[in-house]
């Protein structure tokens, strides 16, 4: 009887030993491969479903005149779109021909958002005369993407005059609202930077302060717009 009990005890001890999990490798190495016929651990999980990557938003090619903005930090070339924004482009060209933009400044630098010019000189004083506003052309199929140029305006839709801004990022929230049946929302894109985006980014990163028409967004050192020229 004692032999049977002893044999049973030895059998239970052996079973318990095999039931204990193997300790992890002392050197922190990789776990051992699964036993023959057993799948790898991650094979028991469903494979991830490939996700379609949305293409980056783009604007259609723009057709129209070009402008050269000569600033104290370098030159910026704009391609305007007189097909999709004819009234806006004609309005801006009028100011260019009248030399309205000469000796003004990029007076607003909203980091990661926009840089803006058109109505103030380097001292932050109002510059020039605005003959009248231009009708809003935001519903023209052009989006406020990085490097695009759009008209600044007041709350009223048809209130843009001389001021415009360059987008430092994709600011699609500034676009015409899809559920707006008329041209009453958004900011009208009328051009695109084709050269000098490095200058735009440099302007967008200058130190700013409160000494200007846009407190907290006024360049500490004025960014002078020496001249805006219509290119042939």
Residue spans for each PLM region:
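Hydrophobic membrane-targeting alpha-helices
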Residues: 13-17
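Cytosolic-facing loops and C-terminal tails of multi-pass membrane proteins
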Residues: 10
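Cyclophilin-like peptidyl-prolyl cis-trans isomerases
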Residues: 2-7, 18-232
């Amino acid at each position: 009887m004692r032999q049977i009990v002893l044999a049973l005890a030895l059998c239970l001890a052996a079973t318990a030993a095999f039931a204990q999990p193997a300790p992890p490798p002392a050197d922190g190495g990789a776990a051992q491969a699964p036993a023959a016929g057993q799948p790898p651990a991650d094979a028991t999980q469903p494979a991830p479903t490939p996700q379609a990557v949305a293409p980056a938003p783009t604007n259609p090619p723009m057709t129209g005149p070009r402008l050269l903005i000569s600033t104290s930090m370098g030159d910026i070339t704009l391609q305007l779109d007189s097909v999709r924004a004819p009234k806006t482009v004609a309005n801006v060209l009028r100011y260019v021909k009248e030399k309205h933009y000469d000796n003004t400044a990029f007076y607003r630098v909203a980091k990661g958002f926009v840089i803006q010019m058109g109505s103030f000189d380097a001292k932050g004083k109002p510059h020039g005369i605005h003959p009248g506003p231009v009708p809003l052309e935001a519903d023209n199929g052009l989006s406020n993407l990085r490097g695009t140029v759009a008209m600044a305006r007041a709350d009223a839709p048809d209130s843009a005059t001389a001021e415009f801004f360059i987008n430092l990022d994709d600011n699609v929230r500034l676009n015409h609202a899809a559920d707006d049946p008329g041209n009453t929302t958004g900011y009208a894109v009328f051009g695109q930077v084709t050269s000098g985006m490095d200058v735009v980014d440099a302007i967008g990163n200058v130190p700013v302060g409160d000494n200007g028409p846009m407190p907290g967004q006024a360049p500490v050192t004025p960014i002078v717009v020496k001249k805006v020229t219509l290119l042939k």
